[in-house]
């Protein structure tokens, strides 16, 4: 039995991270962001997620103003707790986030994923700490055969520890990275 829970957003979420409230002032928010070394924090009403406060949006208001003044204009970006971590990675990348709220089905914020936690899980997922040789192939998608690659590796008394692939849009080639 493999424990793959590290791949699920709920399992990656930090539970004790500060959550902002509508009555919090800009100066308080900026101090929290500095203390926790992030550029974003979730804004909640009761326990429900209303939006993601960015440092940039807070700098646009006076230090004594509350978050209620900007609540309507916030990004409403979060990841479902049951989602695979690659969904979190997609959101981090697309929106250039430093932190991502993890939400349950009722839109309650159950924790956050930081860039550090995400990076640790990516490293674990790709086996970055495992020893092995890395081979990068560029082939036509029609030539791709996982069974053939596996056969070639295994007949040479080795095994595939990790395999990643993607399409290169400019050339149409399939790029395959093997760790052996």
List the model feature ranges, each with a label.
Residues 39, 51-58, 98, 110-118:
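Short hydrophobic beta-strand motif reused across regulatory alpha/beta modules
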Residues 130-180:
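A conserved regulatory-domain signal marking ACT and ACT-like small-molecule sensing domains
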Residues 57-58, 71, 175-179:
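Short low-complexity, flexible loop/linker segments enriched in glycine and/or proline
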């Amino acid at each position: 039995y493999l424990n793959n829970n590290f791949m699920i957003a709920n399992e990656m979420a930090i539970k004790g991270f500060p959550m902002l409230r509508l009555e919090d002032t800009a100066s308080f928010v900026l101090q929290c962001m500095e203390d926790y070394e992030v550029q974003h924090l979730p804004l909640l009403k009761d326990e429900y997620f209303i939006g993601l406060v960015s440092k940039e949006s807070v700098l646009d208001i006076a230090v004594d103003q509350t978050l209620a003044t900007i609540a309507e204009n916030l990004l409403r970006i979060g990841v479902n707790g049951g989602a695979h971590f690659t969904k979190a990675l997609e959101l981090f990348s697309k929106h250039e986030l430093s932190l991502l709220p993890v939400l349950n089905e009722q839109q309650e914020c159950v924790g956050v994923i930081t860039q550090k936690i995400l990076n640790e899980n990516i490293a674990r997922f790709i086996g970055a700490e495992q020893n092995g040789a890395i081979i990068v192939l560029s082939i036509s998608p029609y030539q791709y055969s996982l069974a053939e690659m596996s056969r070639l590796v295994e007949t040479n008394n080795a095994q595939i520890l990790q395999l990643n692939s993607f399409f290169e849009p400019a050339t149409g080639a399939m790029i395959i990275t093997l760790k052996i």
